[in-house]
Amino acid sequence: MEDGFGMYSHSMSCPSTASTSFSSASSSAYDPFTPSSRRSTPNELSLDLDGSCSYAAHQHSLELTPPTTSMAKYFMGQTIKQEPEQMSFGSLPTTPMKKVDGGFAAEYDLIDMNMASHHSMGTITPSNSFGLHTISPETAMGPTSYMMTPTQSLSGSEIAESSSSWSVTNESPINFFQQPKDLSFHDMDSLDLDERHHHHHNHHQHHHAQQSPMGQHFQLHSNTGASPNSMRVQRKMMLHEAQRKTSELQRAQIRESRKRAGKPESGAVDVVRRAMCKCDYPGCNKAFRRNEHLKRHKQTFHGEGPNRFSCEFCGKDQFNRQDNLNNHRKLHARPNSRNRGVEFIPEAVPIIEHEERSRKRRAPPKSKAEKRDYDF
């Protein structure tokens, strides 16, 4: 089981038959996998400058449950008792581990192992044990494939009580938007799960999908294979549909308010004041809202008041003001007058034009441009 090889004329004895036991608790599903060991050098390391380097590698076993007994190994005539080293982990990895510096660097992808808190999962053992290899500066030892074998059977109720809310891979929003490209190890051949572990994992996943509404949402999209781009397009379509319905509702409300405003209410108050000022001349039924309008009516039609003015073109004498007479006379000089009650008289045109030319007019107001010129 031991081979000798030389590397830079040094001797290194590395008994690597070690059994490591640790327990896990699913407190956080996304913290980096950083084990805290109580020992810095759990195995014995000896150097010999004259001999050859021997590397004893039997089977590397990584146990998640403590072994029942400690076993002793014999190496080069010395008895080395390997005690199981207890290591406590805050959480199991759900994110890829960092690469290990050295000849054999293994990159681990996402493996969701949050099945139960404070329960042992199983034993991860190499599926094909590797023997001794001759190590030289040009060569490196490659990783081997592993296999998970559960050591304790868990019931469905225990899994449901002790599981984490984001233990299911498909329920996690990080895993939903960032699906791992490869669920196997970087250079490993296979990842073989036991039939019992697969049954418990499916039961746990189904239980969480029924309990969590968000889990149902992510589970639905993860099962249908929806990509982030398709989900983004779907969200934009839903937003556009909501905006369209909102605008339609606003337009309907505006139309309804206009219809209500157009219909007169039965109990509306009449704000228009009634014509209370009535003419008292016999046979005249005129009524006015304001008293001054009634006074003007009496002066015009009934001859009340002094300063009566008459038109020389038509003979009307119902004008008690000079400006009213002048406006009436101008209407006789306009052939296309809008007032059909005033007749067009051609003889009035030159007279009105002469009065317009001889009338003293006020100086037109200066424009702003002219004022600026004077200021400068």
From Swiss-Prot:
Residues 241-256, 367-376 have a biased composition (Basic and acidic residues). Induction: Expression is positively regulated by stuA through direct binding of stuA to the abaA promoter region. One of its GO terms (biological process) is conidium formation. Residues 20-29 have a biased composition (Low complexity). InterPro entries: Znf_C2H2_sf, Znf_C2H2_type. A zinc finger (C2H2-type) spans 277-301, 309-332. Residues 20-47, 197-229, 241-267, 351-376 are annotated as: Disordered. GO terms for molecular function: DNA-binding transcription factor activity, RNA polymerase II-specific; RNA polymerase II cis-regulatory region sequence-specific DNA binding; zinc ion binding. Residues 34-44, 219-229 have a biased composition (Polar residues). Residues 197-209 have a biased composition (Basic residues). It is found in: Nucleus. BrlA, abaA and wetA are pivotal regulators of conidiophore development and conidium maturation. They act individually and together to regulate their own expression and that of numerous other sporulation-specific genes. Binds promoters of target genes at brlA response elements (BREs) containing the conserved sequence 5'-(C/A)(A/G)AGGG(G/A)-3'. This is C2H2 type master regulator of conidiophore development brlA. It comes from Hapsidospora chrysogena (Acremonium chrysogenum).
